[in-house]
Amino acid sequence: MSILSERQKDDLNKSIAEYLYAQDLTEIADSLCARLSLDYKSEPNSKYAGLLEKKWVSVIRLQKKLIESENRYTALQEDIAAGPARRRDAQVDWLPTAPARYTLTSHRAPITRVAFHPTFSLLASASEDTTVKIWDWETGSFERTLKGHTREVWGVDFDSKGSFLATCSSDLSIKVWDTQQWDNAGYSGKTLRGHEHTVSTVKFLPGDDLIASASRDKTIRIWEVATTFCIRMITGHEDWVRMTVPSTDGTLLGSCSSDNTARVWDPTSGVMKMEFRGHGHIVEVIAFAPLASYAAIRELAGLKAATKAPGAYIATGSRDKTVKIWDVHSGQELRTLSGHNDWIRGLVFHPSGKHLLSASDDKTIRVWELSTGRCMKVVEAHSHFITCLAWGPPVQAGGDIKAASGSGNLRGTGADTERRMNVLATGSVDQTVCVWLP
């Protein structure tokens, strides 16, 4: 019984036939086509031209990468056995320091979003050049380019298992790519259509069955991945919805907009739970605070009541050059963080819960101490505006360190602290992606 699907067998047979035709072995190729009942004629621009050779080279490259990965894993295991506690303690508060470990170049237009694969050392970058590129962040090597959108790509997100990658674009579409099918020539996955203007963000909701998207058409839409149907449209913002992001348990959905507000919604009903007003310009980015940061935020705001409910606090970044931290339940602004000299474009909470990192058009990353609101570090990161940043993937409690590779150190300081790989990625208008490692 063949392990290949019918489509894969057809692609393989046609690739072999094309190779034979290219070698002027026409009689053998014709005989093969007849024997396999294959309806195929060689053409100069056929998608099968050179495909067999490419596959062969890919296998050799994958074998080499497998050997390298096994060697890195063996070295890592030896390192852990020599002193795991000391390594964890030394790295738990790691923060990025210039210069970046890798500067990834291949895009031909500004980078718009970056996202880490949850298991492997892969990084996806979206760009205004209409493509998504996949990189190995541990080695800094380029893996592949995904082509399918016809205009700028604004958002990219992996599901929790890394089986699917969602992207969104100015071409009004959302695409869902099966990561196991990347090597198939011409594959562009499922396409979700319904937005009436640029789709600016796409996010998998916890459980991976649903996707949330935000658009310049002023709506947020919830999509069913299996059927590609839009099952809910959320309205309320008065202008372009720049970003939407779910809370860790999926019970809340945050959004921010060109109407200068941020909002929190019930994604099941579409009902708005809270509106946040205070920014004096477009709100570009929103992030839910993880449980690990709650103690520091309460200290910052002088709050006594403790809560462990996901989605209790959010941070927003705006073109007014400030970052604001809010209490979701009351809508109260807890603190404004000022220091950037230009638009805020990216926010991420440090996995230790002690810091908040922000990225700006002033070309810097700033590290804020959450308990005091003090800017404790400024990193000169890019030669042009920074458009996005992302911290490495979380490793769930009880997760095997084998899920990480190389120097992706796993960290944990308590029950509420999310263990994460110490890696940060930033994207810029300078058309590069920077990878920051210890």
Curated annotation (Swiss-Prot):
SMART domains tied to this protein: WD40
The record places domain LisH at 8-40
- CDD domains cross-referenced by the UniProt entry: WD40
This protein's major location comes to cytoplasm
- A Gene Ontology BP annotation from the UniProt entry: microtubule sliding
Q: Which InterPro entries match?
A: Dynein_regulator_LIS1, G-protein_beta_WD-40_rep, LIS1_N, LisH, PAC1-like_LisH-like_dom, WD40/YVTN_repeat-like_dom_sf, WD40_repeat_CS, WD40_repeat_dom_sf
Record keywords, A-Z: Cell cycle, Cell division, Coiled coil, Cytoplasm, Cytoskeleton, Microtubule, Mitosis, Repeat, Transport, WD repeat
MF annotations from Gene Ontology: dynein complex binding
A cellular-component GO term for this protein:
microtubule associated complex
Residue runs in coiled coils:
58-82
User: What Gene3D superfamilies does the record tag this protein with?
Assistant: 1.20.960.30, YVTN repeat-like/Quinoprotein amine dehydrogenase (2.130.10.10)
- Annotated Pfam families: LisH_PAC1, WD40
Q: Which domain of life is it from?
A: Eukaryota
Q: Where in the cell is it found?
A: Cytoplasm, Cytoskeleton; Cytoplasm, Cytoskeleton, Spindle pole
Q: Where are the WD repeats?
A: 106-147, 149-187, 194-233, 236-275, 278-336, 339-380, 382-425
Function per UniProt? Positively regulates the activity of the minus-end directed microtubule motor protein dynein. May enhance dynein-mediated microtubule sliding by targeting dynein to the microtubule plus end. Required for nuclear migration during vegetative growth as well as development. Required for retrograde early endosome (EE) transport from the hyphal tip. Required for localization of dynein to the mitotic spindle poles. Recruits additional proteins to the dynein complex at SPBs.
User: How are the domains described in the entry?
Assistant: Dimerization mediated by the LisH domain may be required to activate dynein.
Assembly with partners or alone:
Self-associates. Interacts with NDL1 and dynein.
Q: Which family does it belong to?
A: Belongs to the WD repeat LIS1/nudF family.
Q: Report what the protein is called.
A: Nuclear distribution protein PAC1-1
Q: Which organism is it from?
A: Postia placenta (strain ATCC 44394 / Madison 698-R) (Brown rot fungus)
Gene name per UniProt: PAC1-1
